[in-house]
Structure formats: C-alpha cells, structure tokens
Amino acid sequence: MSETILQVKNLKKHYMVGRKGLFGEKEYVKSVDGVSFELHRGETLAIVGESGCGKSTTVKSLIRVTEPTSGEVILKGQDFLKLKGEELKKARRNIKMIFQDPYSSLNPRMTVRDIIGEPADIEHCYKNEEERENLILDTMEMVGLNKDFADRYPHEFSGGQRQRIGIARAIILKPEIIICDEPVSALDVSVQAKIINLLKELQQKLNISYIFISHDLGVVKHIADRVMVMYRGHVVEEGTRDEIFSHPKHDYTKLLLKIGRAHV
C-alpha cells in the first residue's frame, strides 16, 4: 500500500439550530458526524452521496473553509486543525481545490496569466519576473492551454478551457493533495471525458492525491481508486472501486447504484 499522506479522524461539524424551549438544551444539525478516512499518495478517493449527505461539508471542514466542531486532520504529522499563522499558511500550500463552476471561480477582471500565477504571487515562490513567467507558461502547457491565451480573460473561453485554467491555478505550486468539488458536472459530456483524462495524466506526472466529490457515479467509476459513501453525515461504506461497484454491502450504496446517479 502507498504512503498515507492524510488522516481524517472523527471529524464533526454540527450547526446549532435552536433550543428546546426557552431555557432548554441546544439543538444541532449534525452535518458531519464522526467521519474518518485515509488518503494515500497518488490515489483518488471519491466521496459520493445525495444532496445533504455531508460530502461537501466534510471537505470544507477538513481544509477549514468552515471550522469543524471537532476531530483531527493529520497532514505530514501535524494536526491541520490546530495550525495557525505561518504554519497554517505553509500547510495550505499542500492542499488546493478545483471548483464546480469554472466561470464563477475565476476573477473576470484578471487575465489568465494572473489567475494562474496568483498562488505563486501569494507565496512569493519565484526570484524574478522571468521565473514567474516561465512557471506560469509551463503550467499552462501542462494543462493543454495555448501560451498565447495568457493575456486573455475568462469570458473569452469555453467551459472546458476555463476549467483547465482552474486546474492550472490549483497545480502551479505542485500540491500533494487536490480536492475536486464536482469538477466536471457543469461541462458537456464530451468535455467531461477530456478533463477527467487530464486530471489522471497530471496525477501520474505529479503524483497528486485527489479527493473527488461527485454525484455522477459514471465519472466516479472512471477516475476513483477508492470510494467512500456518505449518508446523513456518516460514512456508511468504503472500499475499492471494484468492491463498491461490483459488491456493495450497504443498502444505501445499493440504492445509489440502482438509480445510477446520486442527485445533488
């Protein structure tokens, strides 16, 4: 088995929604309730389930877009949830995200050059403008974007091209982990296949680990090494792609496979 690079232990995210009476106990919605899993180097772990199952809240909590209620997220021997300041900034360099909507996730006032280069600008990881330019153009080439596109703006591109820009932005610092939040659901089927193949190529070149959130089981079957099924904030089943698709154990997993698609 390959190296474990991320361990999530008993992750919880509870939202207070009220009280039982004026002075009664607090009432909570348990969006994520005791989720644990591991991610191995160079693999793709897919998280699937219907809308409201907790899959998106899980990844938002583990990268602290929303602060979790409790749990541990062990990255490189450190609990990511306890890091602050420069330590947190440094750790975040190793976890990046590709978003569902390739248009709304890109600043319309920025050129492709500046969108892709922004993470490098924030980290100051180049010596001069020439090195910055080479880094950006090399990254564009890696994701199949023509270097002549560098001075254009997001509205000038198709959905697939915009997603390539988003992918370039995510990989420019060579992170170890990328969270893919429904990265192809807004794209045409023919474009979906090209983006999935690109993600797989980049994974082989850069040894990236993906956490892949999706409601499309067809896409999951094509890209995932392992699959984690969530229902009402809990992990109900986890296994290899073949185990989940060919020999599901939990009734909820069987239902998802039967309908062929877990609706968002």
Show which residues each predicted segment covers.
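ABC ATPase "signature
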Residues: 238-239, 247
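Conserved ABC ATPase "signature" region
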Residues: 79, 130-148, 257
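Helix-to-loop junction immediately C-terminal to a conserved catalytic motif
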Residues: 63
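A short, proline-enriched helix->beta-strand linker immediately N-terminal to the Walker B motif
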Residues: 172-176
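Conserved ABC transporter NBD signature motif
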Residues: 71-79
